[in-house]
């Protein structure tokens, strides 16, 4: 096998399986063997297979020299069970393989496993995606699973007969299906129930109430958002007072269709598009509450966190299952090897984990190609679990605070931190002297990532202040705000002022947010997300300091927090995401899209309409190559995200706000807004089916129908041993009696054939029950057998004696 890195991404175990089985079939030597005075060609013994596969796994970089011989035997047993190999007589399916001279061979079929394919139509419509699961949600799951031919077919027929019998007996109730009247309250309760059960099924949660309170679901909003839409799927408001102002719609249309909507007859000037964008941004940033509302903040954030960092053990059921990426070290105890009943778990447990290589690879993703700096950073990453404080650099290019600073000791804050707003713990305000203007003081308690030029000097900071000190002028203003606008993102004008050094720097610090409530099924808390954002500082061109000479220096800010999924499984420090990576894992992207699609239906219609129009505008602007630059140093996409993240997602108590997640959510909405903000047709069909079930009179009480709205199915009832013995005898006797009756009443059999068949069986009790008297038996055999006449007795003639 070629030495290469372990496969990444989804279906990791399947890739390893295909790689190992292919190499084993290609490289395993075959020859003739003799067994029991018989020769077999193209086969191998178990010892030969174990030796060859053992050397293969130890020499492969994916598994390494730590693989034991017992693990190799167990993998070969999986080969035998999955028909990769078979014994010399063609038997397979069990794990009866030992370290002996038993002969095996390769079957003609391929052992490769197919990957689950995602068709392109899935991304275009949700109807096809839920084609298999729409009806499955309202059915018991074991009906869709494969059952054995003998038992499953018998049970299904039995259930069908019982259901048909119940329908016949209740025929009178179903003659007039429209007699059952449904009130508006019942319809609303059905909408609430259906959307919550779909959301619970998509996320594979035992209870959706962990994320969403049923009282927060307003059915009127859902029904309005589903029914009142344009041909493009945008909500149409009946009350125009809640709609966007006309001048805002015109401005958004101007930028969305730039430059087509820009009439050449109208006089424009340089920077016209910037002023239009500033007008739109000011309107959305001055809204009384974010578009996703305050009450749904935890719902949207938790969906991203759950979809991005959930493990296999947490998702034991559902329409989407995830393979866990094992991070624990190998266990060589032979008693624990028997616990690998899954082939995937066995393959993943054999993976070779080189910690130094993992840390080096993660460092390369965070740093440039500076080998010496990578080694220093890798050593610092090992101290992640030993440090309990972290700090991050200031975002000097936008007004939003993207820093996630965790302080285990509140007394560590220095006295020069002044309170600003409720969402910020303080602002570092220090007088600037000549020595401080020549250097920036950086300190991080967990990861200190920086790029050092030859002309840049670093000054160490005291350990008592685990914060970045980005110095500002004495006359630098620190505006105090009130309300939702107080911590909104800076507009284009504010960002230009930063670039013109009207504001040289700000230090915004706050505590990390608690994302998820404690889960009763995990007995652990999901604390914080793991993320990183890369920032570029503003360096003054007219400065005579050493920092001014190195104007191209890039200072990276690492915003890192951890998610504790369980006490036994912690992600390593090297598994942070870079700023260009998505918060969600690729195989969970579809889960997040469909979950967010349902969550956006819960929004009030005015908010949903504004969100739809805003996402359409910023998506077109970020993809428009003809759009002039709205900012000299920030790209259009980054500017859209930084500007509108606060007006899309924000929490009421801003201490708990995680701005990085808000930015990631806006970025995710921009990329998938067409799918997320479209109307799911399967939801309407499910509600209609549910209401039709209630109308047919299957539910007498509306309350009972809403609690148990699904039809019940019959299953095998457990019986006692005595009843089983009685049924065994009665069933057998009934079958024999039926056979006797078929023979008796058969018109195709002759009397001779009937007698022959009856003589083959010997059940006198059943026969006597069928023919209690001889008359009844004679009626069956009416043709009496002919008795052969005795031969004529010829008298022998007397032989007269010759003697006289």
Swiss-Prot record:
Q: Where is this region: Interaction with ZNF224?
A: 592-647
Q: SMART domains per the record?
A: DEP
Chain segments annotated as coiled-coil in the UniProt record: 726-760
Question: Which part of the chain is the Rho-GAP domain?
Answer: 282-322
What's a Pfam family in this record? Answer: DEP
Q: Provide a GO biological process annotation.
A: negative regulation of DNA-templated transcription
Record PROSITE patterns: DEP
MF annotations from Gene Ontology: GTPase activator activity
DEP domain segment(s):
24-108
Q: Please state where this protein is localized.
A: Nucleus
Taxonomy, superkingdom: Eukaryota
Record's GO cellular component terms: nucleus; transcription repressor complex
Matching InterPro entries, A to Z? DEP_dom, Rho_GTPase_activation_prot, WH-like_DNA-bd_sf, WH_DNA-bd_sf
SUPFAM superfamilies per UniProt: GTPase activation domain, GAP, Winged helix' DNA-binding domain
Q: Alphabetically list the UniProt keywords.
A: Coiled coil, GTPase activation, Nucleus, Phosphoprotein, Repressor, Transcription, Transcription regulation
As stated in the Swiss-Prot or TrEMBL entry, residues carrying the post-translational modification Phosphoserine are 513
Subunit info here reads: Can form dimers. Interacts with ZNF224.
Q: Relate the protein's function as given in its record.
A: May be involved in transcriptional regulation as a transcriptional corepressor. The DEPDC1A-ZNF224 complex may play a critical role in bladder carcinogenesis by repressing the transcription of the A20 gene, leading to transport of NF-KB protein into the nucleus, resulting in suppression of apoptosis of bladder cancer cells.
Q: What is the protein name given in its UniProt record?
A: DEP domain-containing protein 1A
